[in-house]
UniProtKB/Swiss-Prot annotation:
Ca(2+) 2 binds at residues 330, 388, 390, 396. Residues 143-220, 234-260, 273-295 are annotated as: Disordered. It comes from Homo sapiens (Human). Residues 10-34 are annotated as: Cysteine motif. Belongs to the synaptotagmin family. Keywords: Calcium, Cell membrane, Cytoplasmic vesicle, Differentiation, Disulfide bond, Membrane, Metal-binding, Methylation, Repeat, Transmembrane, Transmembrane helix. Residues 234-243 have a biased composition (Polar residues). It is found in: Cell membrane; Cytoplasmic vesicle, Secretory vesicle membrane. Ca(2+) 1 binds at residues 330, 336, 388-390. The gene is SYT3. Residues 299-420, 431-565 form the C2 domain. This is Synaptotagmin-3.
Length: 590
């Protein structure tokens, strides 16, 4: 009853208030009465509706701004980044100069690999200057190469070259002398236009020519571009034809041909050494002592470097400068070259340059040091191996160079870098690196401990010239994997140090029937991990060194036995044990 009474009382109160509001004069304009009437009739409140509309407009505006930002970001990624990347050079990766055209000279070939021509022509008397001045413009003295912080390949300014358009005095003198541009100059990379005219100039001594003379010289350049393919040279194109009416003018640049009947057959091929200036005693800068190239294969370009021996610290300093005219190993017409350096006969210690993408004329400018006593330097040889980097298969060997007489070469003037032909080598055994680990077996506990110590000289699997290696050890029995253990990942290194123990439980009665497969794997954030190399130890391992290590472990229980093992390619090892079926493809990939 109390509930009904209260409800009835509330209804009566509402009716009373409604009557009072109805009798009040100007009740429609009274805020309280209007609010009360709206509540009685169920109408929404005005301020609440305004707040809802304002909140909705704010949400819509915010969503529009977010969508606009997302659309701008997607447009930038899809349009601006590819357009910007198209501006890169097809050879050296640098920006393509828009002002290069058919009428430019060698100055247009910035980083294009044609500076071996300018360096060779700079030492000829027709160009009015000694040879070493031309080389000094390209390579600074060796003292500057050994400044603090220079190790590791600091960048040097790009070399400049002879540009006929930039020297109207010499161009006018060439036109007056009747010198014609060589239409069959050696192939130059197409960064600035491979068909630029190369003029052989007499000694300059005239005044400034007029603008008309400058225009005449630039019009002599060929109007067509030549593809970057070797084309035969004839004896006529190797020399320039001066005006026969002038007897006092010196003859054209004499470029000597290779001697001997066999070398005479190579006249129709490009020979970069013909354009190198002559050194002391008439010896060309590309030849001389210590030019013992590896093998007698066909030349695969040229490599430039500088040597110096530090007597105080017994250090042989080697600076890799650049390479020219490398062969194309990829389907896109380029290569991804890098250089490995050994000081023979020791092949365990090696250095490697960075990988240069999509170029046939890489500029390295990287310095390395070998510790070698002066008494041993005469018996040591410097070995350069030029490789083409391949992300998904074995790296291709482009060629190699072997140098002896290192002390004599190190005493060459520092401002004159050495040039050598890169000779095509035979199939070189894949150098995947070495792994150092120890084995220890506890018979009473039935525990086999594999301590991964370190690895050295691993194969570079990333474009940075490094790898992200980790070690995976698998316990194998009758060709089946029973257990596996892994080490941690070491980032950006080819010589990782682990010092990590991997423990396996092996019963004493089973130790004669099991073995280990140890693989060094390169970790990839995107895609599958790649095996760098493997080594296998056990009583029936195919490698004799693996069998010896296992037998020594069993002969010395409770003592760690440490050995170095050479890594081999996984596909070359068909089975872990002789006569076993081997690991399945799925197990190997895990």
């Amino acid at each position: 009853m109390s509930g009904d009474y209260e409800d009835d009382l509330c209804r009566r109160a509402l009716i009373l208030v409604s009557d009072l509001c109805a009798r009040v004069r100007d009740a429609d304009t009274n805020d309280r009465c209007q609010e009360f009437n709206d509540r009685i009739r169920g109408y929404p409140r005005g301020p609440d509706a305004d707040i809802s509309v304002s909140l909705l407009s704010v949400i819509v505006t915010f969503c529009g701004i977010v969508l606009l930002g997302v659309s701008l970001f997607v447009s930038w990624k899809l349009c601006w980044v590819p357009w910007r990347d198209k501006g890169g050079s097809a050879v050296g990766g640098g920006p393509l100069r828009k002002d290069l055209g058919p009428g430019v000279g060698l100055a247009g070939l910035v980083g294009g690999g044609g500076h071996h021509l300018a360096a060779g022509l700079g030492g000829h008397p027709l160009l009015g200057g000694p040879h070493h001045h031309a080389h000094a413009a390209h390579h600074p003295p060796f003292a500057e190469l050994l400044e603090p912080g220079s190790l590791g390949g600091s960048d040097t300014p790009e070399p400049s070259y002879l540009d006929m358009d930039s020297y109207p005095e010499a161009a006018a003198a060439a036109v007056a002398a009747g010198v014609k541009p060589s239409q069959t100059s050696p192939e130059l990379p197409s960064e600035g236009g491979a068909g630029s005219g190369l003029l052989l100039l007499p000694p300059s001594g005239g005044g400034l020519p007029s603008a008309q003379s400058h225009q005449q010289v630039t019009s002599l350049a060929p109007t067509t571009r030549y593809p970057a393919l070797p084309r035969p040279l004839t004896q006529q194109t190797l020399t320039s034809q001066p005006d026969p009416s002038s007897e006092e003018r010196p003859p054209a640049l004499p470029l000597p041909l290779p001697g001997g009947e066999e070398k005479a057959k190579l006249i129709g091929q490009i020979k970069p050494e013909l354009y190198q200036g002559t050194g002391p005693g008439g010896r060309r800068s590309g030849g001389g002592p210590g030019s013992g190239e590896a093998g007698t294969g066909a030349p695969c370009g040229r490599i430039s470097f500088a040597l110096r021996y530090l007597y105080g610290s017994d250090q042989l300093v080697v600076r890799i400068l650049q390479a020219l005219d490398l062969p194309a190993k990829d389907s896109n017409g380029f290569s991804d070259p890098y250089v490995k350096i050994y000081l023979l006969p020791d092949r365990k210690k090696k250095f490697q340059t960075k990988v240069h993408r999509k170029t046939l004329n890489p500029v390295f400018n990287e310095t390395f040091q070998f510790s070698v006593p002066l008494a041993e330097l005469a018996q040591r040889k410097l070995h350069f191996s030029v490789y083409d980097f391949d992300r998904f298969s074995r790296h291709d060997l482009i060629g190699q160079v072997v140098l002896d007489n290192l002390l004599e070469l190190a005493e060459q003037p520092p401002d004159r870098p050495l040039w050598r032909d890169i000779v095509e080598g035979g199939s070189e055994k894949a150098d995947l690196g070495e792994l150092n680990f120890s084995l220890c077996y506890l018979p009473t506990a039935g525990r086999l401990t594999v301590t991964i110590i370190k690895a050295s000289n691993l194969k570079a699997m990333d474009l940075t010239g490094f790898s992200d290696p980790y070690v995976k050890a698998s316990l194998i029995s009758e060709g089946r994997r029973l257990k596996k253990r892994k080490t941690s990942i070491k980032k950006n290194t080819l010589n990782p140090t682990y010092n990590e123990a991997l423990v396996f439980d092996v019963a004493p009665e089973s130790v004669e029937n099991v073995g280990l497969s140890i693989a060094v794997v390169d970790y990839d954030c995107i895609g599958h991990n790649e095996v760098i190399g493997v080594c296998r130890v056990g009583p029936d391992a195919a490698d004799p060194h693996g069998r010896e290590h296992w037998a020594e472990m069993l002969a010395n229980p409770r003592k760690p036995v440490e050995h170095w093992h050479q890594l081999v390619e996984e596909k070359t090892v068909t089975s872990f044990t002789k006569g076993s079926k081997g690991l399945s493809e799925k197990e190997n990939s895990e």
